[in-house]
Curated annotation (Swiss-Prot):
This is Nuclear factor of activated T-cells, cytoplasmic 4. One of its GO terms (biological process) is negative regulation of synapse maturation. A motif (Nuclear localization signal) lies at residues 268-270, 672-674. Residues 430-437 bind DNA. It comes from the Eukaryota. Residues 213-293 are annotated as: 2 approximate SP repeats. Residues 96-109, 151-165 have a biased composition (Gly residues). There is a cross-link at residue 689 (Glycyl lysine isopeptide (Lys-Gly) (interchain with G-Cter in SUMO2)).
Length: 902
């Protein structure tokens, strides 16, 4: 290490780390016997104190004592102020040699070697003599946790009684050795070099004997010994101990009689291999320097830590931060001792220096330790919580000499007075900068400009104030980055003038009773201020590029007499003032209708925003692969269109012979790269006439005889012969039956839709009707329609079709001549005849047997169905069949504008 004796011999670290023999007990009043010269060369020997009165409590290594001119390292003394303590030496190191120690019985010298570390001593005046009489008492009256080490008068000067060169911390010493500790001739560079050399030798010695952790940082080191280690028997608890315990704590054997001076060393101190101890290690303090001597009081000694058996080892530190190490503004004023949680990111000491804040506070012996993070600082008081509205429920009545400021929240209605924005501005307006020309007045959403009206007062003209306000979630106030801009010109109809109120530009207009106290705001634009000019203001915290939304704020003061006014205020919807082009895109919010015939020609009305006079509406269709298949521009009616409404004519679809609805899309374009999102639209197929179908359409009846007329009266699709007809897919028949085809149905079974008008060859496309899908509904009975070609009378046999119907109401066909009575449950042929045209709005498409039918109908007949019953044909002839056919043809109603068939 360095020269520690007059013979410049090296200190032997083996004995320091527990390799020497047991030394005889030390005398109570002086030093113990020196080491035998033949056993070992002059070396360090630790003189340990007696176990503390709290029984096997760890002994903390205190700081070195303050220097006293002309004396050697006195015992620690309490400071005058309670709760603070002056430095204490760590322990005595007895050097073997021919010289005798001060007050010692032998020739050994005692060297106070605080952990073999170099540390700074804050020179302060000697403590008061009144406190020297009780060196073992704490300021709070509690006994000291450990006694001072033996031979407290170490640190001999060079050439002293024992002779030899050794450390001298006293400023009064005149040693010129570079190893003299803080001597007059020492400098900081020499101290740092000594620290580096001592630390390297300590690390080498510890690694040689394996007495410590190989980890570099003591705070990250594991336990320096295991619980089975006999040295751990002297610890106060079996809990895990951090490496700082091995640096800072000494253990003592079992309880022994307490004594102010120890009788003999009771254990060896162990060191961790590397790293820096916590603040209790007497390392060079950042606060202690050569240039600061005499400027600061001595730091207090570390307080012993009462360990919590359940607390983890890395949190066990010894040493209380001196009150001087905490800034005055953050010093804790309470009398409680708090322990700050260690920070893993704290750097280790460098050259014997510890970072500020590395010292830990401890509680008095026996007290529980409080680990509260951040207790080095006073709690910051919470900011004052302002109410959301400063006036709360106060009435908006003010004196004319003390009008409310612009950031004062005001209601829009008070009693009968109300300030209302009749027409709101649109949601986007491009504000202009100070270096460019005006971009015009703020526009309204439906076109034109905003309109403001005062309700409940029309006695005399009033002044309407307008300014640009904020649009965030906070209280309404003047906007810092935008101001109102006065617009003038031939097209401006509203007179206005500018004023400045509390640094905010205000536009003032007049509300006239002849205008119903309304004003058209066509004279107000928005001016954008430079962000840098505003952000550099004192107290401004907003950022300009993030505050681009504003509101138009209108305020009026209505006089009430007696020098009082009622102030009401109204704010518009938020307005986006940025120059982003996305805000200028047209938007379609609604449109009607949503479907049209493929022939087009219908009027389509679009509602949205940002529509221009030259806006276009384009219909497109894309294929499954996404390729454009059809594109057509619609014709826009400019006379009926404005900024929020577009009226146009739907164009024709490219294919007019579609049999199902076609999905297309349209969009509004304000120019290149300014298109609205696409909207869906449907083109529907149209109703068309067909040529008369062949006789195969009349299939489904047993007879193969031809009809006496060539007109197709079958309103149902062609169907196979009767045996397979009941098993048809009902979804194919539903569109037609839903329109009322198949009207000869008993009321017991439901049927939907009105009866059709007679039109030859009329057929609707299935896609224009709602289908029921392929789900099989409950089966119902269905009566086929009779035809004159049916030789069996067309009484209609019942068979299951499986279609849902609603129950119809009965109707009365024209009366027929009397005929033989009918036996059977089925109605006569006349039951399925349609009504004349004037009867459609009154009755349904059919009726059941004997329900609403005249007596002639009930008695007519003489024939029966040949399908389901065995009633024989009685007395029917071919002439009667022809007569019935003629009556049937004359009974069909004619549609409007057409003559019935002859």
């Amino acid at each position: 290490m360095g020269a520690a004796s007059c013979e410049d011999e090296e200190l032997e670290f083996k004995l320091v780390f527990g390799e020497e023999k047991e030394a005889p007990p030390l005398g109570a009043g002086g030093l113990g016997e020196e080491l035998d010269s033949e056993d070992a060369p002059p070396c360090c020997r630790l003189a340990l104190g007696e176990p503390p009165p709290y029984g096997a409590a760890p002994i903390g290594i205190p700081r070195p004592p303050p220097p006293r001119p002309g004396m050697h390292s006195p015992p620690p003394r309490p400071a005058p102020s309670p709760g603070t303590w002056e430095s204490q030496p760590a322990r005595s190191v007895r050097l073997g040699g021919p010289g005798g120690g001060a007050g010692g019985a032998g020739g050994g010298r005692v060297l106070e070697c605080p952990s073999i570390r170099i540390t700074s001593i804050s020179p302060t005046p000697e403590p008061p003599a009144a406190l020297e009489d009780n060196p073992d008492a704490w300021g709070d009256g509690s006994p000291r946790d450990y006694p001072p080490p033996e031979g407290f008068g170490g640190y001999r000067e060079a050439g002293g009684q024992g002779g030899g060169a050794f450390f001298s911390p006293s400023p009064g010493s005149s040693s010129l050795s570079s190893w003299s500790f803080f001597s007059d001739a020492s400098d900081e560079a020499a101290l740092y070099a000594a620290c580096d050399e001592v630390e390297s030798e300590l690390n080498e010695a510890a690694s040689r004997f394996g007495l410590g952790s190989p980890l570099p940082s003591p705070r990250a080191s594991p336990r320096p010994w295991t619980p089975e280690d006999p040295w751990s028997l002297y610890g106060p608890s079996p809990g895990g101990r951090g490496p700082e315990d091995s640096w800072l704590l000494l253990s003592a054997p079992g309880p022994t009689p307490a004594s102010p001076r120890p009788a003999s060393p009771c254990g060896k101190r162990r060191y961790s291999s590397s790293g820096t101890p916590s603040s209790a290690s007497p390392a060079l303090s950042r606060r202690g320097s050569l240039g600061e001597e005499g400027s600061e009081p001595p730091p207090p000694p570390p307080l012993p830590l009462a360990r919590d058996p359940g607390s983890p080892g890395p949190f066990d530190y010894v040493g209380a931060p001196p009150a001087e190490s905490i800034p005055q503004k953050t010093r804790r004023t309470s009398s409680e001792q708090a322990v700050a949680l260690p920070r893993s990111e704290e750097p280790a000491s460098c050259n014997g220096k510890l970072p500020l804040g590395a010292e830990e506070s401890v509680a008095p012996p026996g007290g529980s330790r409080k680990e509260v993070a951040g207790m080095d600082y006073l709690a910051v008081p919470s900011p004052l919580a302002w109410s959301k509205a400063r006036i709360g429920g106060h009435s908006p009545i003010f004196r004319t000499s003390a009008l409310p400021p612009l950031d004062w929240p005001l209601p829009s209605q008070y009693e009968q007075l109300e300030l209302r924005i009749e027409v709101q501005p649109r949601a986007h307006h491009r504000a202009h900068y100070e270096t460019e020309g005006s971009r015009g007045a703020v526009k309204a959403a439906p076109g034109g400009h905003p309109v403001v009206k005062l309700l409940g007062y029309s006695e005399k003209p009033l002044t309407l104030q307008m300014f640009i306000g904020t649009a965030d979630e906070r209280n309404l106030r003047p906007h810092a980055f935008y101001q109102v801009h006065r617009i003038t010109g031939k097209m401006v109809a509203t007179a206005s003038y500018e004023a400045v109120v509390s640094g905010t530009k205000v536009l003032e207009m007049t509300l006239l009773p002849e205008n119903n106290m309304a004003a058209n705001i066509d004279c107000a634009g928005i001016l954008k201020l430079r962000n840098s000019d505003i952000e550099l203001r004192k107290g401004e915290t907003d950022i300009g590029r993030k505050n681009t939304r504003v509101r138009l704020v209108f305020r009026v003061h209505v006089p009430q007499g007696g020098g009082k006014v009622v102030s009401v205020q109204a704010a518009s919807v938020p307005i986006e003032c940025s120059q982003r082009s996305a805000q200028e895109l047209p938007q379609v919010e609604a449109y009607s209708p949503s479907a049209c015939s493929v022939r087009g020609g219908e009027e389509l009305v679009l509602t949205g925003s940002n529509f221009l006079p030259d806006s276009k509406v384009v219909f497109i269709e894309r294929g499954p692969d996404g390729k454009l298949q059809w594109e057509e521009e619609a014709t826009v009616n400019r006379l009926q269109s404005n900024e929020v409404t577009l009226t146009l004519t739907v164009p024709e679809y490219s294919n007019k012979r579609v049999s199902r609805p076609v999905q297309v899309y349209f969009y509004v374009s304000n120019g290149r790269r300014k298109r609205s999102p696409t909207q869906s639209f449907r083109f529907l197929p149209v109703i068309c006439k067909e040529e008369p179908l062949p006789d195969s359409s009349l299939r489904g009846f047993p007879s193969a005889s031809a009809t006496p007329f060539g007109t197709d009266m079958d309103f149902s699709p062609p169907r196979p012969p009767y045996p397979s007809y009941p098993h048809e897919d009902p979804a194919c028949e539903t569109p037609y039956l839903s329109e009322g085809f198949g009207y000869g149905m008993p009321p017991l079974y439901p049927q939907t839709g009105p009866p059709p008008s007679y039109r030859p060859g009329l057929r609707m496309f299935p896609e224009t009707r709602g289908t029921t899908g392929c789900a099989q509904p409950p089966a119902v009975s269905f009566l086929p329609r009779p035809f004159p070609s049916d030789p069996y009378g067309g009484r209609g046999s019942s068979f299951s079709l499986g279609l849902p119907f609603s129950p119809p109401a009965p109707f009365r066909p024209p009366p027929l001549p009397a005929s033989p009575p009918l036996e059977g449950p089925f109605p006569s042929q006349s039951d399925v005849h349609p009504l004349p045209a004037e009867g459609y709005n009154k009755v349904g498409p059919g009726y059941g047997p004997g329900e609403g039918a005249p007596e002639q109908e009930k008695s007519r007949g003489g024939y029966s169905s040949g399908f389901r019953d065995s009633v024989p044909i009685q007395g029917i002839t071919l002439e009667e069949v022809s007569e019935i056919i003629g009556r049937d043809l004359s009974g069909f109603p004619a549609p409007p504008g057409e003559e019935p068939p002859a």
